[in-house]
A protein has these predicted regions:
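Intrinsically disordered, low-complexity proline/glycine-rich segments
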Residues: 1-132
Length: 132
């Protein structure tokens, strides 16, 4: 499955849509101003699916993922010298790559779960998400 988002993927205070390959809206992401970053993920009908909240006052960035009121896990940045690496403790996935260039993969051990990369030669920055 392939999804797309345009330009401001991680704009913490805006809302933006993520599209299916055919152009219909798959998800809407709304950023809220709060103590730490907060993103709300909605389905195409406006129903709340999940929330991502930043933990404040931590040495490396950490984000809690909530479904409803229940925290299902944490996404944490690992200490590395050469490239950013994140771990999702609720499923054991890792995220590695060049975040500044929007080119990275999500791995479940040796299996690639998804890849995100910037498409070149578009009028606006378009980022495809290939979901395995």
């Amino acid at each position: 499955m392939k999804l797309y988002f345009k330009q401001r993927f991680f704009s913490w205070f805006d809302s933006y849509d993520i599209y299916y390959e055919g152009g219909s809206v798959a998800y809407t992401v709304e950023g809220k101003l709060s103590w730490g970053h907060c993103l709300h993920i909605l389905d195409p009908y406006g129903e709340h699916i999940a929330t991502v909240k930043q933990q404040v006052l931590t040495f490396l960035p950490k984000f809690d993922l909530y479904v409803g009121e229940r925290c299902i896990g944490t996404i944490r940045r690992e200490f590395t010298f050469f490239h950013p690496s994140f771990t999702m403790d609720f499923c054991g996935w890792t995220v590695e790559g060049s975040f500044m260039e929007w080119d990275y993969t999500i791995q479940d051990g040796p299996r690639t779960v998804a890849t995100i990369s910037k498409e070149l030669f578009n009028w606006t920055d378009t980022y495809p998400i290939d979901v395995a």
